[in-house]
């Protein structure tokens, strides 16, 4: 999916960011009462890199980079610094969570590291969360504010895990939108029953 934040690489090599589409979507959801958490995806997206309009050439470019690489960290920090200022201006910082699709332990750790390196005006960092489809991330579950575990990879202790996380103010959900599971046209209630024994 294309990013709701439009990136432009200026002639001096720095990036600028246009949040118009993101703001519209967030405000539309808030208008309809969907306002507990803003989940921002794509900083560790499937395209492995950054898509931007190059001001010098007028073309759209893709710069390949993966979490943990120095260039990825540099660009991510530049983006997060600007994003955090924008979120503070809109009053959305405290309800925003950087999200990832299913990623490895090293990729997730890289995102946590870069997210913790960029602070807002009060010294706080953005929350981080993501979809989990294996127990590989278990050692860092407590560093993730919000995890959504794929139904097919639920640990045996899911109830205890969810309760422990809840006591720490962390969020745990289950997702069933994977191979052989609920499709978009299905009644949403069907997903709830799919995880019961």
Where do the language-model regions lie?
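Catalytic-core region of carbohydrate-active enzymes that cleave or remodel glycosidic bonds
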Residues: 28, 146-197
């Amino acid at each position: 999916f294309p990013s709701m934040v439009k990136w432009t690489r200026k002639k001096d090599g720095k990036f600028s960011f246009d949040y118009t589409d993101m703001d519209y979507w967030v405000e539309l959801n808030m208008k309809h009462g969907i306002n507990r958490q803003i989940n921002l995806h794509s900083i560790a997206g499937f395209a492995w890199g950054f898509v931007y309009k190059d001001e010098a050439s007028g073309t759209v470019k893709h710069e390949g980079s993966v979490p943990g690489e120095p260039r990825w960290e540099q660009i991510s920090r530049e983006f997060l610094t600007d994003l955090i200022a924008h979120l503070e201006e809109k009053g959305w910082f405290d309800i925003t969570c950087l999200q990832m699709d299913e990623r490895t332990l090293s990729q997730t750790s890289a995102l946590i590291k870069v997210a913790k390196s960029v602070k807002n005006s009060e010294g706080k960092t953005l929350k981080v969360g993501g979809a989990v489809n294996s127990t590989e991330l278990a050692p860092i579950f407590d560093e993730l504010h919000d995890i959504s575990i794929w139904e097919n990879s639920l640990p045996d202790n899911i109830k205890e895990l969810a309760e422990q996380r809840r006591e720490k103010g962390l969020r745990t959900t289950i997702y069933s939108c994977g191979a052989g599971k609920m499709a978009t046209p299905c009644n949403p209630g069907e997903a709830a029953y799919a995880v019961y024994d």
